[in-house]
From Swiss-Prot:
InterPro entries: Mur-like_cat_sf, Mur_ligase_C, Mur_ligase_C_dom_sf, Mur_ligase_cen, MurD
GO BP terms, alphabetized: cell division; cell wall organization; peptidoglycan biosynthetic process; regulation of cell shape
Transmembrane segments: none
Enzyme class: ligase
EC number: 6.3.2.9
Key words, A-Z: ATP-binding, Cell cycle, Cell division, Cell shape, Cell wall biogenesis/degradation, Cytoplasm, Ligase, Nucleotide-binding, Peptidoglycan synthesis
Ligand binding (ATP): G127, S128, N129, G130, K131, S132, T133
UniProt record similarity statement: Belongs to the MurCDEF family.
Primary role: Cell wall formation. Catalyzes the addition of glutamate to the nucleotide precursor UDP-N-acetylmuramoyl-L-alanine (UMA).
Source species taxonomy: Bacteria, Pseudomonadati, Pseudomonadota, Alphaproteobacteria, Rhodobacterales
Record's catalysed reaction(s): UDP-N-acetyl-alpha-D-muramoyl-L-alanine + D-glutamate + ATP = UDP-N-acetyl-alpha-D-muramoyl-L-alanyl-D-glutamate + ADP + phosphate + H(+)
Organism of provenance: Cereibacter sphaeroides (strain ATCC 17023 / DSM 158 / JCM 6121 / CCUG 31486 / LMG 2827 / NBRC 12203 / NCIMB 8253 / ATH 2.4.1.)
Protein name, as recorded: UDP-N-acetylmuramoylalanine--D-glutamate ligase
Length: 465
């Protein structure tokens, strides 16, 4: 646990009592604060009381008298589409609002500077797609190289549940836009921006607000090094804003297709090979085609980001290459479930938006595509240029009929359910083809989350193998 510093003897309200909320309450209590907890769910409140915490109705009048801070969970809206009533009440009372990420940065290692021969460091990863894989890959590379490391944030443990800092340790955090938008302190040593595509726009008031939330990680006084994906205009702009000149090697530009030889420091992938260039010289080349856990151009971008971050930590190219080769990948992200009769079954349930689905569709030459769910704003019209590899689409969920109208001349069948889609795709697939779940939609019409959707796909596939 990371005890929260600077709030000793103060009352701190905690809104949202899921995993991060209860971890926050424990960390506040350990640091000497008095946490006051609230959740709309009676079950969540009862659980908190059962653990000995004080539950206070934060919806009542004058609930924030004497309260120094409100800490809220990331899933609770604080501005768009409308502030949660409790957050609105806190802001009206002049009470600052923070989250567990902000508390982490104000507390991690801050009282132990003299105890370390080598200071702990924090690497943060944000972006629209590839965050989890990049975060896990950095953690894996550091572990394989023998460096002490922990992983948390939007993946793995809550940040305040981490163990106290160790000498020379690297903490790797995956941060969503919800987390970066609200945190009052964001001071990573290395910050990674993978890419940007439309997502969560209702929570940020549009694309500009979404990008602004991501950019907060790179605010002045932020990271010593920045790793920036420049395959979209926003990343290109961000890299330019952070650089004092093209040869500035404090910013490492990464790409999944562009040659970036003219910059101070760059890492890019072309035709399956990763190349590192610094100050006009090629420093390394790695064959990513030999990495079974990193198929496709989108994973090559993830590899470039992780490689660059680990190079800033002093790791040698050959150390990183060996770890890339042993990385097994993450569940529900280009995950091979099995193969039968020359047909491969791949679970990419995490491809919940157009951009991530497009990258999944580019990874294989002949695809039986299972798509659909709860469609997002704009539908999937933007996927039409990427459907050349699709032999046939099998459409499921609430958006099935809308998707059928949006995929042009691509052969398709409305299946409604995962069971029928898997059965039909497996029945019609030919040797050399891939049955790919890449929904391009949220899961909430039929499943509680994308993990359950992916598990259902794998269950149906394994029954056929």
């Amino acid at each position: 646990m990371i005890p929260v510093r600077g709030l000793e003897g103060r009352k701190v309200a905690v809104l949202g009592l899921g995993r991060s909320g209860l971890a926050t309450a424990r960390a506040l209590e350990a640091g000497g604060a008095e946490p006051l907890l609230w959740d709309d769910s009676p079950e969540a409140r009862a659980k908190a009381e059962g653990q000995g915490f004080t539950v206070t109705d934060l919806t009542r009048e004058r609930a924030f008298e004497g309260v120094a801070l409100l800490v809220t969970s990331p899933g609770i809206p604080h501005l768009y589409p409308a502030p949660n009533p409790v957050i609105a009440r806190a802001m009206a009372a002049g009470v600052p609002v923070d989250n567990d990420i902000g508390l982490f940065f104000r507390s991690f290692a801050t009282r132990d500077w003299d105890a370390f021969d080598q200071m702990p460091r924090v690497v943060c990863v944000t972006g629209s797609n590839g965050k989890s894989t990049t975060t896990a890959l950095i953690h894996h590379i550091l572990s394989e190289a023998g460096r002490p490391t922990q992983m948390a944030g939007n993946i793995g443990r809550g940040v305040l549940d981490l163990d106290p800092a160790r000498d020379g340790e690297v903490v790797v955090l995956e941060l969503s836009s919800y987390q970066t938008d609200l945190a009052r302190a964001l001071t990573p040593d290395v910050a990674v921006f993978t890419n940007l595509s439309p997502d969560h726009l209702d929570r940020h008031g549009g694309m500009g607000g979404y990008f602004a939330a991501k950019r907060r990680l790179f605010a002045e006084g932020g990271p010593d090094r920045a790793v920036i994906g420049v395959d979209e205009p926003e990343g290109l702009y961000l890299a330019g804003q952070l650089s004092v000149a093209p040869e500035d090697d404090r910013v490492i530009r990464i790409s999944a297709g562009q040659k970036l030889e003219r910059f101070g420091w760059s890492v890019f992938a072309r035709k399956g090979f990763l190349a590192e260039w610094r100050k006009g010289r090629q420093m390394a080349s790695i064959d990513l085609r030999a990495m079974p856990g990193l198929p496709g151009a989108h994973n090559h971008q993830n590899a470039c980001a992780a490689y660059a971050a680990c190079r800033t930590m002093g790791l040698a190219p050959r150390q990183i290459e060996a770890a890339l080769a042993s990385f097994a990948g993450l569940p529900h992200r280009s995950q091979t479930v099995g193969e039968k009769g020359g047909v491969r079954f791949v679970n990419d349930s995490k491809a919940t938006n157009v951009d991530s689905a497009a990258k999944a569709l580019q990874a294989f030459p002949k695809i039986r595509w299972i798509a659909g769910g709860l469609g997002k704003d704009g539908g999937i019209v933007a996927l039409q240029p990427h459907l050349g590899s699709v032999v046939k689409a099998y459409l499921i969920g609430h958006s099935a009929r809308d998707f059928a109208l949006q995929i042009g001349a691509t052969d398709h069948e409305i299946c409604e359910t995962m069971e029928r889609a898997v059965a039909r795709a497996a029945e019609e697939a030919q040797p050399g083809e891939v049955v790919l779940l890449a929904p391009a939609a949220a899961s909430f019409d039929q499943y509680p989350n994308f993990e359950k959707r992916g598990e259902d796909f794998m269950e149906k596939v394994k029954a056929l193998l």
